[in-house]
Amino acid sequence: MDCSELDSTEKSKPSQLLRAINQIYEEGREESTHSETNAASVEKTMNLLKEKAETGDSQATFLLGQLHYVQGCYAEAELIFDRIKDKDPQALYQLAVIYYDGLGTKEDLGRAVEYMGRVAFWDSSEAGSVRYAALYNLGQAYLEGFGVQASSSEAERLWLLAADNGNPNASVKAQSALGMFYSRPESLDLRKAFFWHSQACGNGSLESQAALGLMYLYGHGVQRDSDSALFCLKEAAERGSVYAQGHLTACYYRRQLYSRAAALGQRVCEYKDTAAIAQQTDCLEEYVRKGIAIGMFYYARCLHLGRGVPQNRDKAKHYCTQAVRIDPLICKELQIDAAHGKI
């Protein structure tokens, strides 16, 4: 379950969370020395939060649980969050994540979805941005049938609530997800897909920026515009979208810019850990793999024909085989194009 849309306090690494806590409770707080170890700093901060929590400071109680959470002490975090879950939507949200992913406890999808639903429809303004994140995750659960009966119509309804008409403070992930949703054969509406990818891109979504590049390139949901397509793909590629890098390699090749195609394709071939890349770029791993397969296939084509690089058919065969292993379906389409002389 995704918690990446929470604010920096909730999703940060231990050192970032420590800094945030110290800024909140900076009064009477001694500055950490450079020689102070991270463990000592964590212990000092935990003691401070415990003192504040004992006086009834609800924020300190949540932050104490969150500090345990980012330290990987999930059992302790669960106990603290459980005590305040009926009053604090952020704590309830984190409990949902713990049960969904089975962090330090047995996986419980039913309870996770129940808690996420309570956050999504929390009857108070206290929920803030965490409500949008919960709506997004709840929609994802309905789309995939995790903890509930699968329902694409319910997923769509929840994502529309989470997207909030393109509100930049709402769930950008939901906006991007709607763009993907309306691009599926089962719920195809390319004009809606273009609208939502545009909203998400404007709000910073890397994945939607890459998708917009392809929509402009092929005229899907919008008039074909090769300049806008290249602009979106180049910028998304520079920001780290492997999917955009793969398609940009293809664009260069088809425009007979073989040296550029070979250089970018070779770079894409160096990517190995798709899960880590997906996490770092906040993009779906499926599309990271597609980007690598496309870039690798076109680099293999450059090597096979000696375009932009010295001809090396053994190396070309190696990369072509690797590309097929990564994404056989997309490579099958590319092989058909190659057989018909389109590549």
From Swiss-Prot:
May act as an adapter that regulates LRP2 function. Its main location: cytoplasm. The keyword Cytoplasm applies. InterPro entries: LRP2-binding, Sel1-like, TPR-like_helical_dom_sf. Pfam families: Sel1 (PF08238). PANTHER family: LRP2-BINDING PROTEIN. It is found in: Cytoplasm. This is LRP2-binding protein. Keywords: Cytoplasm, Repeat, TPR repeat. TPR repeats lie at residues 58-91. It comes from the Eukaryota. GO terms for cellular component: cytoplasm. Disulfide bonds: none annotated. It comes from Danio rerio (Zebrafish). Sel1-like repeats lie at residues 92-124, 132-167, 172-205, 206-241, 242-273, 293-328. The lineage of its organism: Eukaryota, Metazoa, Chordata, Craniata, Vertebrata. Gene3D superfamilies: Tetratricopeptide repeat domain.
